[in-house]
């Protein structure tokens, strides 16, 4: 039952932002096909290599993407580390303390940057990695449309609505219905 619940909530976390966005914004698939044609392939290869080393990586990346999307949308702010400015990052939030996978995304980003410097956003790399992780875990493969004009918010967001990693399915169901 836990596995089914986890898969359902993972699918909702990944697909809901895309469905909601599609209703209000212009989406463009294949955004990087001319700017960095190898971007998605680089992400695929890097995620595949990470999965060979650790079969738990797909779940970690899907959860990381979920936490990034849940509060205010897909912006990769969950990957930011706290700096000396004393403005805490999302990684310092209690809800995000146990997240695994940022190191994998950092490595993927470095590989993409080596091929196409300053071109592919961290948010898109995380989205591609979550999609590829979903597929590697036995889920579907889907296209990632890109939306320009995302708003970026730095610092710890309100996690009063975010599900805890130890929440029961019934609790998560209530949170998703809010």
List PLM regions with ranges.
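Folded extracytoplasmic luminal domains of secretory or organellar precursors
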Residues: 2-5, 13-178
């Amino acid at each position: 039952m836990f596995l089914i619940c986890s898969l359902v909530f993972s699918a909702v976390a990944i697909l809901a932002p895309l469905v909601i966005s599609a209703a209000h914004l212009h989406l463009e698939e294949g955004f990087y096909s001319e700017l960095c044609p190898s971007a998605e392939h680089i992400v695929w290869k890097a995620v595949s290599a990470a999965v060979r080393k650790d079969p738990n990586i797909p779940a970690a990346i899907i959860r990381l993407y979920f936490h990034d999307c849940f509060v205010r949308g897909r912006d990769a702010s969950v990957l930011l580390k706290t700096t000396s400015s004393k403005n805490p990052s999302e990684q310092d939030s209690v809800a995000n303390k146990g997240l695994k996978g940022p190191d994998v995304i950092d490595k993927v980003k470095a590989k993409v940057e080596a091929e196409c410097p300053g071109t592919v956003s961290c948010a898109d790399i995380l989205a591609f990695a979550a999609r590829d992780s979903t597929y590697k875990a036995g889920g579907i493969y889907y296209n990632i449309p890109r939306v320009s004009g995302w708003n970026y918010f730095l610092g710890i967001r309100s996690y009063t609505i975010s599900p805890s990693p130890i929440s029961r399915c019934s609790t998560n169901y209530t949170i998703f219905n809010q």
